A protein has these predicted regions:
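Terminal leader/tail segments of proteins
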Residues: 2-3
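Accessory beta-strand-rich segments of carbohydrate-active enzymes
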Residues: 6-24, 29-32, 36-41, 55-61, ...
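Beta-propeller folds
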Residues: 36, 48, 62-63, 71, ...
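Mature N-terminal segment immediately following signal peptide/propeptide cleavage
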Residues: 45-57
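Generic detector of ordered secondary-structure context
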Residues: 46-49, 74, 120, 204
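Short Gly/aromatic-enriched secondary-structure transition segments
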Residues: 65-87
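N-terminal glycine-rich cofactor-binding segment
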Residues: 99-113
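Contiguous beta-strand segments within globular domains
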Residues: 229-237
């Protein structure tokens, strides 16, 4: 288990060798349904949206994030510093930090893979419920888009890390969940070494900016679907 201080010490967001921890490998984005009727009506009871109002607090740098991010409850003084934020959204257009537009220049000094030590860090907290029957299955959480890197905890236990702002990040929560209420904590870092690859004529906006879903799957399920083509006899090269 890694706490906040330990993930800050690892400094994964400036390590070009590390771009994920415990993230499930990318796979085809197919959907599973319990019955043919559900499939025909596109009714997916196995996929639950976690979008909505989350608790949010912005810090000037990862090193400033307190261990209380992982606490089950916050003190009255700490709670006063947290505000509701819409997920999905970006924090700059929710009244936190400033958006930056760049064409060909970077928004920080160029020294890859180093990014500024004053690196705005958005912390998110939310809760959701899980039933006894759901605990018997595999429960994956899918972040469809987070800019630019993030660490994830569930019920105070470290789950993993991901960067790559425009691709989904999926983690298996099965070993971390309990029956009843569960809590998530997410630490989003604005700048990472991946930011060097993502800069070109764009607005820099940060946070959990795409959907978050909890996907419940049978213990045995189809994880990936792919096609391996072959050349016909009439094709030469």
């Amino acid at each position: 288990m890694l706490n906040v201080a330990q993930v800050v010490a690892q400094n994964d967001w400036q390590n070009p060798v590390v771009f994920q921890r415990n993230r499930i490998n990318a796979h085809s984005p197919h959907h599973g349904y319990k019955t043919l009727k559900d499939a025909l009506h596109n009714t997916n009871a196995q996929k639950r949206s976690l979008n909505g109002q989350w608790d949010f607090r912005l810090f000037e740098a990862p090193a400033n994030v307190p261990e209380s991010l992982l606490s089950k409850t916050l003190s009255d003084d700490e709670s006063a510093n947290w505000q509701p934020i819409a997920v999905p959204s970006n924090w700059q257009l929710q009244g936190h930090d400033k958006p930056i537009y760049c064409n060909v220049k970077y928004p920080f000094a160029v020294n890859p893979p180093v990014v500024p030590s004053e690196n705005p860090t958005g912390c998110y907290r939310t809760t959701f419920n899980v039933t006894k029957d759901e605990l018997k299955q595999r429960n994956h959480i899918v972040f469809e888009g987070v800019n630019s890197a993030f660490h994830l905890w569930c019920n105070g236990e470290y789950v993993g890390y991901s960067q790559d702002s425009r691709l989904p990040a999926e983690f298996d929560l099965s070993g971390y969940l309990v029956e009843g209420e569960n809590r998530l904590a997410v630490m989003v870092i604005r700048w990472s070494d991946g930011s060097y690859l993502e800069d070109q004529d764009m607005w820099w906006l940060s946070g959990i900016f795409r959907d978050v879903n909890l996907v419940t799957k049978p213990q045995h399920h189809i994880q990936d679907v792919f096609v391996t083509p072959s050349l016909g006899a009439c094709i030469t090269y």
